[in-house]
Amino acid sequence: MKLPIYLDYSATTPVDPRVAQKMCECLTMEGNFGNPASRSHVFGWKAEEAVENARRQVAELVNADPREIVWTSGATESDNLAIKGVAHFYASKGKHIITSKIEHKAVLDTTRQLEREGFEVTYLEPGEDGLITPAMVAAALREDTILVSVMHVNNEIGTVNDIAAIGELTRSRGVLYHVDAAQSTGKVAIDLERMKVDLMSFSAHKTYGPKGIGALYVRRKPRVRLEAQMHGGGHERGMRSGTLATHQIVGMGEAFRIAREEMAAESRRIAGLSHRFHEQVSTLEEVYLNGSATARVPHNLNLSFNYVEGESLIMSLRDLAVSSGSACTSASLEPSYVLRALGRNDELAHSSIRFTFGRFTTEEEVDYAARKVCEAVGKLRELSPLWDMYKDGVDLSKIEWQAH
């Protein structure tokens, strides 16, 4: 076993060696390095063939038509293109958008920008289980609603929303539905032939592919129109200009091919590891699982260790790569906005750690990590006067602390 141990697979995944091999074949003079837009010679034709093969591989994982897959630089760009693209194209129909308070910042910052442009946005509060239900969406729908954006799998707590049911609702009301699925590819089965989802964002680097490449699914029937956010050359049917990065696209295609073939077995294995880890750390008192215990992916365990400061715990776990909150914003000392939206108090939100398991996690690593967590929590609680008071039977919620 090598240290440190990587347990932050929701932040990013290492590139699968099979993916890296395919990518290397598209970089040098001996390989498939051509510009896919070069129509006049074989180098361009071969590159275009590789790009279209990858487009088919991505489409197959989610049961879509390859023509519905648009290449982007990642899920952040896909979210921007979907939300701004719809808002700008359909603004004459209405200026109301619905999303949730626990979306990724790529969605929330995009809707904030649209608010500055005169759009109105409703931010749904999740239940204590971290889920957004169709009933919540239905209650927020208005005559002028043009778009609903509710994610599939939450990046911080791993909860899984029922996007099929939300899609049935939005389609029946003539409202477009966008889903951020960055965290669900390779973890949860997606069937876009059946689901009434209009737009879906994908990322390669959350699915053992390279960083810097993603895709947006844009439904053809019924047709969804977007206003391009990037201009210059008219690539990707005018929706996203820019020379296509053949090596990254081929990498994403291969990553999604592997995900399709190995998802079922991999999820079972990871569920076993996650359960093993959770059982061991649950021997500690005052450990809380954040988000639904059932509607979640097994890859993600977000736990709060009461009477322990999350940052101190991370510092104590020097051999473990884990996170508190989302990697994009984990430098902030504010408690996680996702956990606050669940109704967790500041103390529990501050004491949360996200453990995420993946393809290369082993049983030995999980056992070592659980042992280290139990040791660190025990030591930190020994230093905590609040822990002493709790052990003495003091109800800390009833104490009025003096402000200073």
From Swiss-Prot:
Residue sites binding [2Fe-2S] cluster per the record: 328
List of residues that carry N6-(pyridoxal phosphate)lysine: 206
E.C. no: 2.8.1.7
Positions contributing to pyridoxal 5'-phosphate binding: 75-76, 155, 183, 203-205, 243
InterPro entries referenced in this protein's UniProt entry, alphabetically: Aminotrans_V_dom, Aminotrans_V_PyrdxlP_BS, Cys_deSase_IscS, Cysteine_dSase, PyrdxlP-dep_Trfase, PyrdxlP-dep_Trfase_major, PyrdxlP-dep_Trfase_small
Keyword Ligase found: no
UniProt keyword list: 2Fe-2S, Cytoplasm, Iron, Iron-sulfur, Metal-binding, Pyridoxal phosphate, Transferase
Matching Pfam families: Aminotran_5
Gene Ontology CC, one term: L-cysteine desulfurase complex
Main location: cytoplasm
Pathway the protein acts in: Cofactor biosynthesis; iron-sulfur cluster biosynthesis
GO annotation, biological process: [2Fe-2S] cluster assembly
Catalytic activity: (sulfur carrier)-H + L-cysteine = (sulfur carrier)-SH + L-alanine
Subcellular location: Cytoplasm
Transmembrane segments: none
Molecular function via GO: 2 iron, 2 sulfur cluster binding; cysteine desulfurase activity; metal ion binding; pyridoxal phosphate binding
Cofactor: pyridoxal 5'-phosphate
Residues annotated as the enzyme's active site: 328
Keyword Lipid biosynthesis: no
Top EC class of this enzyme: transferase
Family statement drawn from the similarity comment of this UniProt entry: Belongs to the class-V pyridoxal-phosphate-dependent aminotransferase family. NifS/IscS subfamily.
Record-linked NCBIfam families: IscS (TIGR02006), PRK14012.1 (NF010611)
Subunit structure: Homodimer. Forms a heterotetramer with IscU, interacts with other sulfur acceptors.
Entry function: Master enzyme that delivers sulfur to a number of partners involved in Fe-S cluster assembly, tRNA modification or cofactor biosynthesis. Catalyzes the removal of elemental sulfur atoms from cysteine to produce alanine. Functions as a sulfur delivery protein for Fe-S cluster synthesis onto IscU, an Fe-S scaffold assembly protein, as well as other S acceptor proteins.
HAMAP family registered for this protein in UniProt: Cys_desulf_IscS (MF_00331)
Record protein name field: Cysteine desulfurase IscS
Species the sequence originates in: Azotobacter vinelandii (strain DJ / ATCC BAA-1303)
